[in-house]
Amino acid sequence: MLEEKNLITNDGIRIAYYDTEESKQPILAVPGIGSTAILWEEVAKLFASDYRFIVIDPRNQGRSQRTFKGQRISRHAADLEELITKLNLKNIIAIGNSMGAANIWAYVSLFGYNRLQAIIDLDQPPKMIRDSSWEYGFKDLTWQNYPDYLKINFGNGIFTHINDEMFKKAKADSGKFRYFAEENYLCRIEHAMQDWRDVLIDLKIPMLVLAGQNSPFFDYHFAFAMEKLNQMISAKIIKNCGHLIQAEQPLSMYKEVMNFLKRI
């Protein structure tokens, strides 16, 4: 259903993406750091009857090229812009899990809203470092232990069982296209230091925040704190779910997103 394609960026990097290639309103999905497009397969099937579904493997992960270049959120946003331009996508529903949501916020900051209808954030607060202005950070990350704390292997964030076939595919792919966390460390620390609240306070399009109730990375109450930033933002909690909402609870995610899209 999802056919693999490739984009060569303006800095010469091959980006893999997957596309149902239908003439419907597009959903553009962005995995988090270290994750893969394969883990979106089940939720893609649910959306396919009503939407064109596109999911990107960000640079340095999935089937995309490994490179030392572009280990920053702005470059990931530029990759999205190049893909959107290549496919001439309009009226996009952009869905980002974890750092994928930050990539979308960076895209909005740099390129605006003209091609977007709505944003869905899957388990990513606007700020990762806990301080006096924001209490819902990433685990125990503070300015006192940043960035060394990010060298720890925190696992994949999965709380509940995911589809066996999809998991096997992802595991097989990870053996062929290995992800090296240490080679993406600069991107990880750049991601963690960002504060996207200025972008979200000024957000001009609707955004749904879905938080995993059992996420090992974030206190799900961050979603309700995000609601208070802007009346364009709404929040829902996905039960029995960790950090990878699209893989752990695809049906619950689909229902919440569809209900959200009907309201806007």
Question: Each predicted region: which residue ranges?
Answer:
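Gly/Ala-rich beta-loop-alpha elbow adjacent to hydrolase catalytic centers
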Residues: G96, G100, I104
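Conserved HGGG/HGGXW glycine-rich cap/lid loop of the alpha/beta-hydrolase fold
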Residues: I13-R66
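Conserved acidic catalytic loop of the alpha/beta-hydrolase fold
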Residues: R75-I92
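Alpha/beta-hydrolase fold catalytic core
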Residues: M1-I27, S49-Y51, K90, M258-I264
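Conserved loop-alpha-helix segment in the C-terminal half of the alpha/beta-hydrolase fold
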Residues: M207-C241
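Catalytic active-site module of serine/aspartate enzymes centered on a nucleophile-bearing elbow/loop
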Residues: M232-I264
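Conserved alpha/beta-hydrolase catalytic His-Asp/Glu region
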Residues: R130-G137, Q144-D202
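Flexible "cap/lid" loop of the alpha/beta hydrolase fold
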Residues: W105-L110, R115-P147
